[in-house]
Amino acid sequence: MRLRGILFDLDDTLADSSGTEEVVWERVADVIDEHVDGIDRSELRRRYLDVLEGHYSELAAGRIDFVTFRRRRLADALSPWGEVSEELLERYIAAKEAIADEMRPFPDAVATVRALRGEGIRVGVLTNGPSRFQRRKLEVSGLGPELDAIAISEELGVAKPDPEAFEQALALLGTRAEETAMVGDSLENDVAGGLGAGLAAVVWMPGRREGELPPGAHLARELAEVPRLLGLAV
């Protein structure tokens, strides 16, 4: 069956967040320093990264919302030094969300999306994250108006890799699973999720990530490679 649609992940797939991570971390650490005494930044960062997976799995499963996710992650990371006040939580969230204003599309993102749409392919985004945060990224990066559909986990009420997230995104895109591909940087959320949802094809764009490409998936180093890998002449 001819491919009629493609769903892209947003962060580190269409838009580049790699250059913003250090900046945002420094902002977050500065905010914490102002509220909590005796912080060891290197230890704080280690703990901050270590506690991510456990809380994110709760978020992805829909058992907690993004505010709760951020509160619990920060509280766990800070537990050796003290408790998280409401003021600290608010300033922490503001510092985290400032990353949206730093987002830029990859150099070939807009051209690739336009080329695909020019060939009649419907193009959408399926992204995990808070609605306000992700929509701001799409606005700042200029990608929003280029898309046929935008599916954000907070709005869907379910996150990748749950098959229901893909089902809802397909409904917004107006295509069926067997005629739609998924492109993203996460082996779990995008590749395994897309395969599990029965999509026609999945493309892994690892960027700085490491992992083993599963059977049935394609590997792309740049967005411009995606159409060729999917057998599209654009």
Regions found by a protein language model. Name each.
Residues 17, 21-22, 38-42, 63-67, ...:
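Alpha-helix N-cap/helix-initiation sites
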Residues 1-6, 18-19, 110, 114, ...:
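Asp-based, Mg2+/Mn2+-dependent phosphohydrolase catalytic module
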Residues 33-39, 80-85, 142-146, 174-175:
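Short helix-capping segments at alpha-helix termini
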Residues 21-32, 48-52, 70, 74, ...:
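Hydrophobic alpha-helical core bundles mediating ligand binding, dimerization, or RNAP-core interactions
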Residues 63, 67-68, 86-87, 94-125, ...:
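Short, acidic loop-to-helix structural element flanking the phosphoryl-transfer center
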Residues 46, 50-94:
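A metal-dependent, Asp-based hydrolase signature
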Residues 1-47:
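Active-site neighborhood of HAD-like aspartate-dependent phosphohydrolases
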Residues 23, 27, 47, 73-76, ...:
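Alpha-helical elements of Rossmann-like donor-binding domains used by nucleotide-donor carbohydrate transfer enzymes
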